[in-house]
């Protein structure tokens, strides 16, 4: 039997008035009916104990709950229950109304009160001789002795089980926060109320219970210093314990004050368990003493030997009794040890202020309403489970936010480095190389040069006065359909508009036969610049600069060379690169095809070095290249570039004349050429003429001597909208600005 009492007689008598208790705690009482339930063993059940009236201190079981909850709670409950008739409204949820008459209270004055003094002193760090009258409690009836039994058993069980369950002291209950408020007024008004103990109502409530809980920790340091004084008074007052209940009751209150403050301070600091190691008298050491006293009382059957000698009681802190001295050696410490412990606790109070409330259970939320909001209060309000869940969520969000901020700062740093040193990236880029080093002035100079021309023989030269008119008419008319490409150029245009000979129209190249197979358009290697359109799965259409005599055949769509016989793009890069820096023309004539069918496949390309932006641009350019009858593919050419065309009859030369100031900016769909400048007297781009007999134009090639540079100019509007990367766009813009300034 644990914490149940001193002997078997008490157990038998107690079983008569009490119901079954928890079997583990009270095996002999398990079969008996009636009485409250067993004390809880966890914190949730402990909280339930404080909210259910039937779970209040009743027998050893209820007292054990107090011991598991906190030592201060049990001590204060016992002491104040003794003073206020055992059932105060301070324990409103837990009171079991008592019907004890004045006779039972009078019994308590002489014997039970003295035991209560000893139990209170024991909880405050002093030796106790509590078990003196254990038998007397069991001898009475339940109606007479129920309050006293609850008080006594609460003290004994809290002392007997405290060492075994000392790990639960870190979770004090609401009483550890409430009772210091009452303790602050005990010195003033409680002792006056303690004298007429018999007249007190069992349900009288102390007025100081509802005071601000901030006094819980303010009076700890003051009361700790008075512990020794009150202990000396209480020990000295044991001499007069037989004189009357009034004087002993005052001692009870003094002891209650000191003992509760000591135990409250123990719960106010988490360092209470360290005190036994430091050599100071600690509350946790006292259960050993009381257990030894219980055993001694049970064996000897008398407790007078521990209480009667007053001299031993006065010197008990310095020299304990032999029976107790054998059990616990910590009691040999002087009284200054407890004061030293109080000094250390006061020194640690400022550091552990936040940790004090952390040890409170969920039932103590009402005691901290007047304090400032702190995480510990939130724990008490929403519970530890919800608090830690919310805390984990907040920490995760902060971690994600920190990672995002880190990435943002890294991106900003990279952008600043790119903006500060673009030349480093340009030098390390093999694709760029020197592609962006040519200036606009150089580009303009190259554009001023005439395009390659196809010169016909003198026999084909006919009156050229009709060329402007024909050019104008062809420019204003809508472009013919694809099926009218070759026949219209050879037949319809000559019959209806020109009126020239229909049988002598054919192209006769002036170039020698050994140059027939050479390209009519030749590029100058050192000055060619190309922006290769590449489709990227992530960025879409991207331009990659390329510097060389000609665009790479494998990675670029062929540029268009207008006003020229459609040329076939070589299938391999080797043929392309070995064709004297030009676009090779197949040896056989390129037939335009029958009407109604496309005369130019996708691998054909006409005029003025415009890279294909996308397949749509290629289709539009091919559509324009299907009309070899000159400006018909560009019906609105005059509108864009103010270009006038002079077309020659079968014996003449078809020429393009453009003003020097006219330029057509390259774009993906509107204009298929970059910057076209043709002089009236300069060489003209090669253009085939159709024969009247077969109406099949033959490709003709110009001379290399008449060919000049064709440079791919980087369009500014496209370079600004390219989306390959911000660094590449920035580098291009910076280089162009530097070139403009120079």
From Swiss-Prot:
* InterPro entries for this protein: ELF3-like (IPR039319)
Transcription regulation among keywords? yes
One Gene Ontology CC term in the entry: nucleus
Q: Where is this region: Disordered?
A: 1-23, 115-163, 186-248, 280-337, 451-523, 665-726
Locus of motif Nuclear localization signal: 344-349
What GO biological process terms are annotated to this protein in UniProt? flower development; regulation of photoperiodism, flowering
Q: What does this protein do?
A: Involved in the regulation of flowering time.
* Name of the protein: ELF3-like protein 2
Q: What are the alphabetically sorted keywords of the record?
A: Flowering, Nucleus, Transcription, Transcription regulation
Localization of this protein: Nucleus
List, as start-end ranges, the regions of compositional bias called Polar residues.
Answer: 211-222, 294-306, 314-330, 501-523, 688-724
Task: Give the superkingdom in one word.
Answer: Eukaryota
Q: Where is the composition biased (Basic and acidic residues)?
A: 232-243
**What induces this protein's gene, according to its Swiss-Prot or TrEMBL record?**
Circadian-regulation. Expression increases after midnight, peaks just at dawn and gradually decreases during the daytime.
Q: Which gene encodes it?
A: ELF3-2
